[in-house]
């Protein structure tokens, strides 16, 4: 016996060494993946991807006016380009949200980011496939020094290019337009899994009380992206469009010149690189992170009525146990479920109303913001670069702050359903009041010879207005472009040619009839409007306040939405949200706003005998129509918020016997009856009904999990 002890001890030692080595290997293996097993690391990665997505989306908006001039497009045309992103997103959002919830969500998000990177690179391709921009001759005839002057004396008569050659390039321009649309569709397809799967993945792996803060941070980064996009647009439009092909030291124009075209394509290349590198990180995360605490206490399933035959399941259809019964369902059977699930969700008035309200709010952002840079250029006579820089440094950061504050208020004040919807109603009213003030903040078009006032500013009926007059009828002035000049008489002329200037130094302008010939000169640009600078500063301040307050409703709306559906339907509910946001909130508004803006045009340029881009707008009509559309959408959103509040209030009366459906003053923003404790009432008799109320706010057919929908 004594002799066996050393042997046994030695064997035990070897066994202990083996176990120690295995434990050490497991420890090293665990250490290798630990950085991707933290939900905060995923939040950072998702924020980086959403930041890049927001950047490329806003960058397109920042260069829309540049694209108009580069490819001679109308506002309705660029509206189609802006809406193409949503069309691509719309095509796959439901399928990705439904099937992606059961798949490897981080990898799907990474694949979507790579597709977006490809779309961004394709967006820059038209510049390398079309002819170089020639500002000396341009698409019109300029004088020897690059100015459009009167050719009555024969000077500059042979300076312009062959018109037939220019018109033959029209077909190539149309192809570039279609390529831009296709690239935006590809961007939309790639963005499909990023938001719904990212939000549901985060909501699954954080404590419920922290969910609003995490989602608020996520959407803050999504909105901070446009700030980066506008700043990037401001930088790129200061670089000449063909800077990589020519020696820019020989240029005699600056970004302040109306003929300047910036390097609109450069930002797309940079955004493509950012999208690619931020997407690569997503492939390191697991399908499901380790639970941070007892799932029975933190999961939303704990709030559902308990059934003995049901096993606890994580939300969004992500199964920690791979042998669940529904994993054997065929793809065709799962496709048949989608209409039933969609009908079930839309049959809930609270769910439907809050989604439609979000659509109206997003419609204001999509339509108003898409042409806000153009609006600043027209109303306040800013350059494209200055408008983009101001938007990127003022309004958008304020919107980011508003989204973050909205999520923080939901967390810190423990807002109930009624508190959250009342908060949304309040911020909607305040932001609508800001939009109303925009009706009175702007500048007039001012006198424009032959367009708003007759030449010589004589009392001629408006019907007799004509850009061509006896003073310039022999000048062979072209209308391919708009290069306004301000005359010494305080009147704006469409170009130096229309002012009758026969010299490239902008002197001897025959159409300045009220000015002595020796003083008949013009300077480049529109004539300034009195009081315009003060109106612009006020507009900028109000815009910042409006952006911050209006954005505070976004996070409460999303939180209400994901709390009104059963956990298994969360990802799909978010997919329905983003589908309707694209269908109603993102696609129609740019088209509607663009068509409305075109209707206020006073003078159209012509290109090869066809109507080109608008050269001059009626600023007053532009302002009233542009702002009124936004006010109408905000008002409709308020009605939908009110309907949601009425539905919630009715259910509070129905299910909470002692509350009477009203809220005290202290409960206006911070009701102690929160969604967190509403389903955990200690009274067993009411627990089922109150829990049912959380997910079935309008007493429709109750759905506890996916199997009951089948």
Curated annotation (Swiss-Prot):
GO cellular component: apical plasma membrane; basal plasma membrane; basolateral plasma membrane
Taxon lineage: Eukaryota, Metazoa, Chordata, Craniata, Vertebrata
Extracellular side: 61-79, 132-174, 244-261, 367-386, 439-539, 598-630
Family: Belongs to the organo anion transporter (TC 2.A.60) family.
GO biological process, one term: prostaglandin transport
The protein's name: Solute carrier organic anion transporter family member 3A1
Kazal-like domain sequence ranges: 465-513
Membrane topology annotation: Multi-pass membrane protein
Positions of region (Disordered): 1-25
Disulphide bonds in the chain: 471-501, 477-497, 486-511
Organism of derivation: Bos taurus (Bovine)
């Amino acid at each position: 016996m004594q002799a066996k002890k050393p042997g046994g001890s030695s064997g035990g030692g070897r066994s202990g060494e083996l176990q120690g080595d295995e434990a050490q290997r497991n420890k090293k293996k665990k250490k290798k993946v630990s950085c991707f097993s933290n939900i905060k690391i995923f939040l950072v990665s998702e924020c980086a991807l959403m930041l890049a997505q927001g950047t490329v989306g806003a960058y397109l908006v920042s260069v829309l006016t540049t694209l108009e001039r580069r490819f001679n497009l109308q506002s309705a045309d660029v509206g189609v380009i802006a809406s193409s992103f949503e069309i691509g997103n719309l095509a796959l959002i439901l399928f990705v949200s439904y099937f992606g919830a059961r798949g490897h969500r981080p990898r799907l998000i990474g694949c979507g980011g790579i597709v977006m990177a490809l779309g961004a690179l394709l967006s820059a391709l038209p510049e390398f496939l079309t002819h170089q921009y020639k500002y000396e001759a341009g698409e019109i005839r300029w004088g020897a020094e690059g100015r459009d002057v009167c050719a009555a004396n024969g000077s500059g008569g042979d300076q312009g290019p062959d018109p037939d050659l220019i018109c033959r390039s029209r077909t190539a321009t149309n192809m570039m337009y279609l390529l831009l649309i296709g690239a935006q569709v590809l961007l939309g397809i790639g963005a499909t899994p990023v938001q719904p799967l990212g939000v549901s993945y985060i909501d699954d792996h954080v404590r419920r009380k922290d969910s609003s803060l995490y989602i608020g941070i996520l959407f803050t980064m999504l909105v901070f992206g446009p700030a980066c996009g506008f700043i990037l647009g401001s930088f790129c439009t200061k670089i000449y469009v063909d800077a990589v092909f020519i020696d820019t030291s020989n240029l005699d124009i600056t970004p302040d010149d109306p003929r300047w075209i910036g390097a609109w394509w450069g930002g797309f290349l940079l955004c493509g690189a950012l999208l690619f590198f931020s997407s690569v990180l997503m492939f390191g995360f697991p399908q499901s992170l380790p639970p941070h605490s007892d799932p029975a206490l933190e999961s939303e399933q704990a709030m559902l009525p308990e059934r003995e035959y049901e096993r606890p399941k994580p939300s969004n259809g992500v199964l920690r146990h791979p042998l669940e019964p529904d994993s054997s369902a065929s793809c065709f059977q799962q496709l048949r479920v989608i209409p039933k699930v969609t009908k079930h969700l839309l049959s809930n008035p609270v769910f439907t109303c809050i989604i439609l309200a979000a659509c109206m709010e997003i419609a204001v952002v999509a339509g108003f913001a898409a042409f806000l840079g153009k609006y600043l250029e027209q109303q306040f006579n800013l350059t494209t670069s200055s408008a983009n820089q101001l938007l990127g440094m003022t309004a958008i950061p304020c919107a980011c702050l508003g989204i973050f504050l909205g999520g923080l208020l939901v967390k810190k004040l423990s807002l109930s359903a009624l508190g959250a919807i009342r908060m949304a109603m309040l911020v909607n009213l305040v932001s609508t009041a800001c939009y109303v003030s925009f009706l009175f903040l702007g500048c007039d078009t001012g006198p424009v010879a032959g367009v708003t006032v007759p030449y010589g500013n004589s009392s001629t009926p408006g019907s007799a207005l004509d850009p061509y007059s006896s003073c310039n009828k022999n000048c062979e002035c072209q209308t391919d472009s708009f290069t306004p000049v301000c005359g010494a008489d305080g009147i704006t002329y469409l170009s130096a040619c229309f002012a009758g200037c026969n010299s490239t130094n902008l002197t001897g302008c025959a159409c300045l009839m009220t000015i002595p010939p020796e003083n008949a000169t013009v300077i480049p640009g529109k004539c300034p409007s009195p009081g315009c600078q003060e109106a612009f500063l006020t507009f900028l301040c109000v815009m910042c306040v409006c952006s911050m307050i209006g954005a505070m409703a976004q996070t409460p709306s999303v939180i209400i939405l994901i709390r009104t559906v059963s956990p298994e339907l969360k990802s799909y509910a978010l997919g329905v949200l983003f589908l309707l946001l694209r269908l109603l909130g993102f696609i129609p508004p740019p088209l509607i706003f663009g068509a409305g803006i075109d209707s206020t045009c006073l003078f159209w340029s012509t290109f090869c005998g066809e109507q080109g881009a608008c050269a001059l707008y009626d600023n007053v009509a532009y302002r009233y129509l542009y702002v009124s559309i936004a006010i109408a959408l905000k008002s409709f959103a308020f009605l939908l918020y009110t309907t949601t509040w009425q539905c919630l209030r009715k259910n509070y009366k129905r299910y909470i016997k002692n509350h009477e459906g009203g809220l005290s003053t202290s409960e206006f923003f911070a009701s102690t009856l929160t969604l967190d404790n509403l389903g955990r009432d200690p009274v067993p008799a009411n627990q089922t009904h109150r829990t049912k109320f959380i997910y079935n706010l309008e007493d429709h057919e109750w759905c506890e999990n996916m199997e009951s929908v089948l």
